[in-house]
Amino acid sequence: DTATSGRVVVDGRDITRASENDLVEYRRADVGFVFQFYNLVPNLTALENVELAAQICPDSLDARETLEKVGLANRLSNFPAQLSGGEQQRVSIARAVAKNPKLLLCDEPTGALDYVTGKQILQLLQDTCRKDGITVVLITHNAALAPMADRLIRFKSGKVIEMSVNPSPTPISQIEW
């Protein structure tokens, strides 16, 4: 999308004025996406889906290790149709994390996961943010997750209605939903 007003500045660079090719390069190298619908390539294994994304990035993480971090070490050779919805979601998360992006955009990343796995994934995302210095933007309708955030932006009807900073985020282990 093209901005209709204002500016978007990333790492000191105004990407509002960037060419389409520059935006493609920016997204490819610096942004990881976790989609609500997983968008896995059906004829590639879990490992190959993650490797595909990692190949386009200069400082990517090891695909196998990233899949292990999301609890899929024993499902590397499975195709998406052989995985449950939650497993497919974890492949999607691993694919985004393996790019080692500066910005990770996650749309309902725990939506298809059970409670325990959801907490593990939230912990992985928080660790990725804190330890690796990656900015993680978590988009969710689950208000119970808000206390874990460093910053919170609330939307209503497509408009920002509140922005706040959380000086002491709640550990994920203490969040219940």
PLM feature spans:
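ABC family nucleotide-binding domain
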Residues: 1-155
